Amino acid sequence: MNKSTLLIADIGGTKSDLALFNAGDIRTPQVQRRFINAQYSGVEEILVQFMATVGDVPTVACFAIAGIVSKHQGRMTNLPWEFNCAHLKGRFGFTKVILINDLTAVASCLKHLNPTNPSDIHTILKGRPDGGAVTGVVAPGTGLGEGFVVQCSRETFVTGTEGGHSDFAPVDAEQVALLLWMQKEHKTVSFESLIAGPGLARLYDFCKVYHTMGESTDVMKEMAGKVDRTPAIVAGAIASQPCPLCLKVIELFLRILGSEAGNLALKIYAKGGMYLGGGILPRLMGHVSFDGFVERFLNKGAMSPMLAEIPVTLILNKNAALIGAAGYLVEALSEDGGEE
């Protein structure tokens, strides 16, 4: 078994990315594989298949999961998968296993991103950075991840949260109608239920009725028989001849996301900046205007001038969660601490 190699896993609601990193270079995975979760009964089945292909198995691992982590255990929010560090050690021979929330991993990657590399980040709102102690992260994907980083002297505290499950608050007539429409079938309406996972499909169905808009034949064909309609909606919005309905959906999605990103920035006083993660937003860049996002991010009454000073940055590095989890594990090993 190899002590200098790290096994890193980013376990999302839809897919899982597993990789091996050398402890001295956490920017570049030595081996990387992607697994579609629906094809597996749990993470152990994925691990068995992955390890069969890597040869020399590492002794240390970090699992970043889209779910709740408590001490040495965790469970996924959108999958019936559970994690137990002691069990994983016994089953696979690890000497150390760390379990963290996936947004803890994304937040941990921030210091490893290169601000001058256009493949790593893109500025949405320049702001006036002052090196504040707190930085926030919002990442729409299968779920709506939220997290933050606190820098205190030479110590750094990083954590993911379940803030995406907070109650959706409409800010205009369209969003009031959306809330009432959602409440017909849902007892609670969270931000996650609208701007993550099946949320875009819900926005699509709502906009079709609220704005009395017809559907694109091409988009309907792409959606036919698909459980997840989000890829078709995004593709329709960024096409060379965009689908008007899909574009309307994405514009509403960005406005709601902007509101919630502004909410988080206010709550944690994110003078260190706000970062946007997830797989949807990078696809939109260059095709769809983020003006609606910025407008709603700033629309906080007396606090708008303060928010205008906060830089907002889009994370483009596709391995952000893996890099962050690898960095988290390296630091835990150097301190001989962490969540085992």
Task: Indicate residue ranges for each PLM-predicted region.
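ATP-binding/phosphotransfer module of carbohydrate and carboxylate kinases, centering on a glycine-rich
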Residues: 1-57, 177-340
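Short coil/turn connectors at secondary-structure junctions
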Residues: 3-4, 93-95, 130-135, 144, ...
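Short beta-strand-loop/turn "lid" adjacent to the catalytic site in phosphate-handling enzymes
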Residues: 54-117, 282-286
